[in-house]
């Protein structure tokens, strides 16, 4: 097989005469201080080295300074400079003793087995029941589902420094092959066969993980980082140790940074944030270039690029491929790339090509022989059809052309193609060449030099067997900087968090303002300290979604061997420390002194230090559940149960002696308990609490009646005759811990933080919930297609063939003439405004397809956003008309817009998503049957019939359809709406040639039927380009280069450019690539002609302006009047029904969310029920009953955090739907509130049955039982709607988690439990207390539970005092008669002994709640008020959904 046969022809440039593949003959490692045998003259070598260094420096400056200059050099000159730069870099490296890491790949008999689609079905709420009952069905025990071969018996190889192009249609197995070459095997059932890397077996190759990397199709980056920050981080993690002499790390990183940004033309975007589908940032093409650049930073020996030209224009894609070619030639980098669409220019840069169909290898060999091989098999290639399109097209019955005389003899199925290949002489030659290559590997042993060089690249402190280049501490430092940048990148949320904390601290401080050192202040002071811990715990809830977010980025960078996952957690906790310290200090500096805690600097700093430890421990605990859990909802619900445990067993709500033994162990396994004990000891250890005015006995009418020697404080720790209680005695007797253990408890609090840190590090190292990047499909039960079945393959081919033939030429579309004039679009930037569209004008007419082209970043997507009325930011100037009239309210509805980002609701199947679009966007006069028939037609045309019942899913979880299939679904969603005008933003990006052809052919039919449409397209083949009638070509800055007809065989278009001095376009050349080259598109493209200015002076523009003036003067066209324009196709009532049905289906299919709340309620109910097991009628049990209800209140409040992520996610999908006018804001808002109700009802009922009777609250009054259940359910309705209202306001999860604690502080602090109503400051009691729904919940349910409860104090509950008048026959009751305002009763402790008396605080439950100012008579009023609060929250949801209904773009 010829090696690198097409290199010089493809690149058309010269190279260096230096043989860079021959390393210097050094026997000793570089840097050991010795010289090799027969070493040359040292001085002479140093002089030569310095000469090369100076030459490299000159070349570097020329390249790095000149890559972005305009109108100076032609394209080949730019390639020459890049080649020369790399060659000189390699010469210097060789002179420094470095050796190229030349590693090829040899694959033999590779078979990859995947799970069949029938192995798992779409999970829903019935799944657990079915699984349970299947345990009792022996017939199901052995049913494990089918498997299939994703790849079947693949044998090929790629030499070191070689470039292998892998071609195949989507689903053929190209991505799997690339993953296996990069040694990513985790997601597959079985991998059979042999892969060797330069002779190193795959098992051993794991030690060199970062030396073979896989760059996935999707672009995964932190959206708030800039390009500079993203690449700088990668460079810090991959900076090699054996750099050039005296070259500093910073210099090395800057050199590589400048080089790569110059190579890929993103120099001007260096300080632009990356962005994503929800955050504005880089364009799609620029983001793709960043992905490629990041992969190159890894400096891997073998790089696998999966569809890496997706989103790039043809010129940029060619520049990228040329850069890869040069790097492969000069640096001996081995490249394997998979492209769905590639031009001949790109194709010719590769040495070999492998073609895969349905997992089978049907060709492997030189690229220049592949076309002839298939022609010899009996296939023919159309004129102007690119070689890659032809090679993939031969496997498609609808695309391939059979040569005359070969009918019935050509292969039909993938198995036929594989058999033909294996029977060919080329296959036998390939096997011989592979054997020869493997023998060469055995002789030359490149692995020896490779291993030595890998070791030399590692930093001195990096273990030699480590897969990482830099040391652990270096990784941590880089991650600390990146984490800080991510946090500061969202500075609005950070500042909002601190402002929220500071604001809330005043609320907390005012509630417990200047607590008195009296007996009532004992419990209140403990409540203040407890609330300080609880406040920071609620803030830590934000860590759960943040832990889940970024898993895919971690998985990618982990595969690049950038850093250990545990290093990421170390960096997180390092950045946590200052942020937490600031947070706690802002909180403490206010509350400590407002609380009236001891004015002692040491105690203040102990308070802060302990709170910091408790907050850090809680934050890490939340991360533990996030890292050990596959789902946010699982971790959220489990964490809520644990949080209830921690709150209950910290020692505040239940003192340690009152804890039942079955759960008392959690007191010792609870970070909160140690923090609480430390803070209590810090405050109470040397305090005394006075009780002169409240000591027992006490006569309100005659305060001096009783002798103080016989009075006692009504508090644990009291001593008769001493009218004060020592804080340390209170801690000892009531809470059962010593104040001397302060230091120990602080230390243990931090020890928990360390333990949780270790658990997180373990989880991040050994758990990967992303599925390794492999997307696994799940189907409805019984709907999974058969895999690797020849008959099924023929059936699918026939479906597509029938769909193609059924495309009706008589389709009737309601199109119109859409014109736009003088469109300018500016956006605010730092220091002024930036013009993104500059005076763009044009039109689209029925029956015409207009192509919108230009280099990446030229403003194509921006123009479509403006024309489709999707822009909500910036300033738009200019005029748009439809049929001569200004755009009306129904424009967005009748317009189809296929956006670049594929945003779909993951809980639906493909067919359900399409039907939903058809039902809500097609005219209501069209029957449902006709709408569904059209959906099936589109499914067939999009080659998605077999995916109709597949779950859309998400890429993050690895469950759902692939990236390419999502793109097809995006197009289908718009097509089924039968729009009047169609805008398509890169509809063929990421699709193979045949899929692209089918889509373009389909929209060509729509155009022929009368639909006007405009389509941005990056890499059109000649065949695709011929389907378009007109073209609008943009240059950077949104300037028009050309707008007009393309003409037959593109003659009108090409003649325009030839008129101004561009070379003629050849017959075999792709006109789309020709015009991009002519106008200087691409990374390094340049042109001597100022095309925007040329266009302004051209006669074509004058003709365009005359035509636009004529269209405007003609006025509204006499089209059929269809009545008053409607913003939405269907009524609000119909929309509401359909949206509710969809949301209900999504909730039904999310058992993690629904069953998670059920399980949370059950566990919480059992925990709370058994914690307050069988409460009796003692005085202390009155308190326990109230705290039982308080725990139920906390459960409801915690539900707020559970609904946040679901609502925010669904709101993003709603914004996308609303922009296309699927449905109004009201149906979504009311549906998402109502859909929760049945699930909340079940959750509340579960809690009721698990806790009510367990805690001993059963009474013979059924109305009391019913009331408890009813008001609790309504309270849960309120809590969920409250969380939804907050989520409707906030635009991201972090902000919502910042705002929630500020609001819930008013809920639980002002409910009347932690601070009794009479003690609440007048300012708050006057309005917040009365506006707090939790107050009405507590009043209603407490009075309901305690109404018929009599109190009988135990010996421990009594306040003991001596009756000195007992010797005179005075009984206890006579000695201390109870009179208002006192409550309770007095009796002798021991029957017959009236000298020892006891005072019980209450006679019955009514006396208890009367002291709070509550009344049983208000219970139905309270219930009604909770309903009112719930309705108010619902109105807030509706209001804020309306206000935030439009996405920021």
Swiss-Prot record:
ATP binds at residues 854-861. Residues 488-731, 1152-1386 form the ABC transmembrane type-2 domain. The chain crosses the membrane at residues 519-539, 577-597, 602-622, 634-654, 747-767, 1155-1175, 1188-1208, 1228-1248, 1266-1286, 1296-1316, 1423-1443. GO terms for cellular component: membrane. One of its GO terms (biological process) is aggregation involved in sorocarp development. It is a multi-pass membrane protein. Residues 14-25 have a biased composition (Polar residues). Residues 1-10 have a biased composition (Basic and acidic residues). One of its GO terms (molecular function) is ABC-type transporter activity. This is ABC transporter G family member 21. The gene is abcG21.
């Amino acid at each position: 097989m010829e090696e690198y046969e097409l290199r010089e022809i493809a690149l058309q440039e010269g190279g260096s005469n230096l043989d860079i593949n021959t390393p210097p003959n050094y026997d000793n490692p570089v840097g050991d201080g010795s010289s090799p045998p027969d070493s040359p003259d040292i001085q002479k070598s140093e002089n030569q080295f310095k000469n090369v260094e100076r030459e490299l420096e000159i070349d570097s400056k020329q390249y790095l300074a000149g890559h972005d200059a305009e109108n100076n050099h032609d394209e080949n000159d730019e390639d020459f400079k890049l080649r020369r730069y790399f060659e000189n870099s390699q010469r210097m490296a060789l002179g420094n003793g470095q050796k190229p890491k030349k590693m090829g790949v040899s694959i033999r008999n590779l078979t990859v087995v995947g799970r069949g689609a029938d192995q798992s079905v779409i999970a829903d709420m019935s799944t657990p029941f079915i699984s349970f009952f299947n345990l009792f069905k022996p017939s199901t025990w052995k049913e494990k589902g089918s498997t299939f071969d994703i790849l079947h018996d693949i044998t090929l190889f790629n030499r070191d420094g070689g470039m292998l192009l892998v071609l195949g249609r989507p689903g053929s197995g190209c991505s799997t092959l690339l993953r296996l070459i990069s040694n990513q095997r985790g997601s597959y059932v079985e991998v059979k066969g042999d892969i060797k890397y330069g002779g190193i077996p795959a098992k051993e190759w794991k030690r060199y993980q970062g030396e073979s990397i896989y760059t996935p199709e999707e672009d995964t980056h932190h959206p708030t980082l800039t390009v500079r920050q993203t690449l700088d981080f990668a460079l810090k993690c991959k900076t090699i140790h054996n750099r050039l002499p005296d070259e500093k790390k910073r210099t090395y990183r800057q050199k590589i940074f400048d080089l790569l940004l110059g190579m890929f033309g993103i120099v001007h975007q260096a300080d632009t944030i990356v962005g994503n589908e929800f955050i504005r940032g880089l364009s799609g093409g620029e983001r793709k270039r960043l992905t490629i650049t990041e992969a190159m930073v890894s400096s891997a020996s073998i790089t696998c690029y999966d569809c890496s030209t997706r989103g790039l224009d043809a010129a940029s894609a060619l520049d990228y491929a040329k850069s890869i070619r040069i790097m492969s030639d000069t640096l001996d980098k081995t490249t394997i790339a998979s492209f769905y669409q590639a031009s001949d220019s790109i194709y010719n840069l590769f040495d070999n090509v492998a073609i895969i169909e349905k997992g089978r290898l049907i060709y492997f060999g030189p690229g220049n022989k592949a076309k002839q091989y298939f022609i010899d098999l009996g296939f023919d290639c159309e004129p102007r059809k690119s070689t890659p399109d032809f090679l993939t097209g031969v496997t498609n019955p609808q695309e391939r052309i059979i040569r005359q005389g070969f009918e019935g003899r050509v292969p039909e199925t993938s198995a036929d193609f594989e058999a033909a290949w294996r029977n060919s002489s080329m296959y036998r030659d390939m096997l011989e060449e592979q054997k020869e290559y493997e023998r060469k590997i055995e002789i030359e042993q490149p692995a020896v030099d490779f291993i030595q060089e890998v070791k030399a690249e590692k930093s001195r402190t990096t273990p030699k067997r480590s897969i990482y280049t830099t040391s652990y501490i270096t990784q941590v430092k880089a991650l600390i900087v990146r984490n800080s940048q991510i946090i500061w990148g969202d500075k609005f949320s950070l500042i909002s968090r601190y402002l929220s904390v500071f604001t809330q601290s005043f609320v907390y401080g005012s509630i417990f303002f200047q607590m008195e050192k009296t007996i009532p202040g004992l419990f209140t002071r403990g409540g203040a300290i407890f609330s300080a811990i609880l406040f920071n715990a609620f803030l830590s809830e934000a860590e759960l979604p943040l832990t889940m977010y970024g898993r895919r980025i971690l998985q990618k960078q982990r595969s690049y061997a950038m850093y250990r996952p545990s290093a990421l957690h170390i960096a997180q906790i390092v950045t946590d420390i200052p942020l937490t310290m600031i947070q706690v200090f802002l909180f403490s500096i206010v509350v400590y002194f407002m609380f009236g805690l001891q004015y002692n600097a040491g105690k203040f700093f102990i308070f802060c230090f302990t709170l910091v430890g408790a907050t850090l421990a809680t934050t890490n605990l939340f991360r533990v559940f996030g890292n050990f859990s596959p789902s946010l909802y699982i971790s959220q619900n489990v964490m809520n149960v644990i949080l209830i445990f921690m709150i209950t067993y910290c020692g505040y709500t239940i003192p340690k002696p009152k804890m039942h033994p079955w759960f008392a162990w959690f007191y010792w396994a609870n970070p909160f308990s140690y923090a609480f004990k430390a803070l209590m000891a810090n405050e109470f250890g040397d305090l005394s609490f006075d009780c002169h005015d409240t000591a027992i006995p006490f006569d309100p009418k005659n305060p001096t009646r009783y002798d103080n020697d016989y009075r006692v404080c009504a508090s644990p720790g009291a001593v008769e005759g001493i009218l004060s209680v020592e804080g340390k005695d209170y801690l000892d007797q009531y809470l059962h811990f010593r104040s001397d253990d302060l230091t120990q408890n602080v230390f243990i609090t931090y020890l928990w933080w360390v333990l949780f840190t270790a658990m997180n590090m373990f989880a991040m190292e050994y758990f990967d919930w992303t599925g390794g990047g492999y997307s696994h499909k799940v189907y409805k039960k019984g709907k999974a297609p058969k895999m690797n079945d020849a008959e099924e393959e023929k059936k699918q081919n026939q479906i597509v063939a029938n769909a193609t033939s059924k495309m009706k030429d008589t389709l009737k579309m309601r199109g119109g003439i859409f014109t736009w004039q003088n469109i300018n679009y500016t956006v605010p930037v730092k220091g002024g405004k930036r013009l993104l569209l500059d005076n763009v004008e044009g039109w689209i007419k029925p029956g015409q397809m207009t192509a919108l082209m230009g280099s990446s970043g030229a403003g194509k997507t921006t123009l479509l956003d403006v024309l489709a009325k999707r822009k909500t930011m910036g300033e738009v100037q200019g005029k748009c008309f439809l049929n001569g009239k200004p755009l009306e309210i129904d424009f967005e509805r009748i317009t189809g817009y296929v956006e670049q980002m594929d945003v779909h609701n993951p809980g639906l199947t493909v067919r359900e998503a399409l039907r939903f679009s058809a039902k809500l966007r097609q005219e209501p006069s069209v029957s449902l049957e006709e709408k569904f028939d059209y959906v099936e037609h589109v499914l067939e045309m999009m080659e998605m019939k077999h995916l109709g019942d597949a779950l859309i899913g998400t890429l993050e979880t690895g469950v759902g359809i692939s990236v390419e299939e999502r793109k097809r679904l995006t197009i289908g969603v718009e097509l089924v709406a039968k729009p009047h005008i169609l805008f398509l933003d890169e509809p063929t990006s990421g699709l193979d040639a045949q899929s692209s052809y089918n889509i373009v052919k389909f929209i060509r039919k729509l155009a022929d039927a009368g639909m006007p449409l405009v389509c941005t397209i990056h890499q059109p083949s000649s065949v695709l380009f011929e389907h378009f009638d007109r073209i609008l070509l943009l240059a950077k800055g949104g300037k028009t280069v050309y707008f007009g007809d393309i003409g037959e065989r593109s003659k009108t278009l090409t003649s325009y450019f030839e008129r101004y001095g561009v070379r003629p376009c050849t017959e075999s050349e792709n006109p789309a690539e020709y015009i991009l080259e002519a106008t200087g598109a691409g990374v390094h493209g340049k042109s001597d002609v100022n095309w925007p200015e040329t266009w302004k002076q051209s006669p074509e523009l004058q003709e365009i302006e005359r035509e636009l003036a004529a269209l405007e003067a003609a006025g509204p066209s006499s089209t059929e009047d269809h009545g008053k324009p409607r913003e939405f196709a269907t009524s609000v009532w119909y929309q509401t029904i359909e949206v509710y049905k969809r949301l209900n289906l999504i909730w039904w299919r999310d058992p993690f969310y629904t069953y998670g709340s059920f399980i949370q309620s059950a566990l919480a109910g059992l925990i709370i029920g058994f914690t307050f097991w069988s409460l009796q009628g003692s005085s202390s049990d009155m308190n326990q009953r109230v705290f039982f209800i308080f725990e139920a209140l906390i459960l409801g409040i915690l539900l707020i955090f559970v609904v946040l992520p679901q609502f925010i996610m669904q709101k993003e999908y709603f914004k996308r739907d609303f922009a296309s006018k699927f449905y109004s804001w009201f149906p979504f808002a009311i549906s998402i509130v109502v859909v929760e109700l049945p699930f909340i009802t079940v959750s509340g009922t579960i809690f009721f049955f698990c806790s009510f009777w367990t805690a001993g609250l059963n009474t013979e009054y059924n109305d009391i039982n019913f009331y408890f259940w009813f008001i609790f359910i309504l309270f849960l309705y309120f809590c969920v709607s409250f969380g939804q209202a907050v989520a409707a306001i906030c635009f991201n999860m972090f902000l919502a988690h910042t705002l929630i604690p500020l609001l819930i502080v008013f809920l639980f602090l002002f409910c009347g439990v932690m601070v009794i109503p009479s003690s609440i400051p007048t300012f708050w009691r006057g309005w917040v207390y009365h506006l707090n729904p939790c107050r009405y919940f507590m009043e209603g349910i407490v009075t309901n539970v305690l109404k018929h409860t009599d109190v009988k104090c135990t010996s421990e509950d009594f306040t003991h005092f001596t009756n000195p008048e007992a010797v005179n026959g005075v009984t206890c009751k006579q000695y201390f008669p109870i009179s208002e305002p006192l409550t309770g009763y007095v009796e002798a402790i021991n029957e017959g002994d009236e000298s020892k008396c006891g005072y019980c605080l209450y006679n019955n439950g009514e006396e208890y709640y009367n002291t709070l100012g509550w009344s049983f008579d208000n219970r139905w009023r309270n219930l009604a008020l909770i309903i009112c609060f719930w309705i108010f929250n619902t109105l807030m949801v509706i209001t804020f959904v309306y206000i935030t209904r439009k996405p920021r773009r």
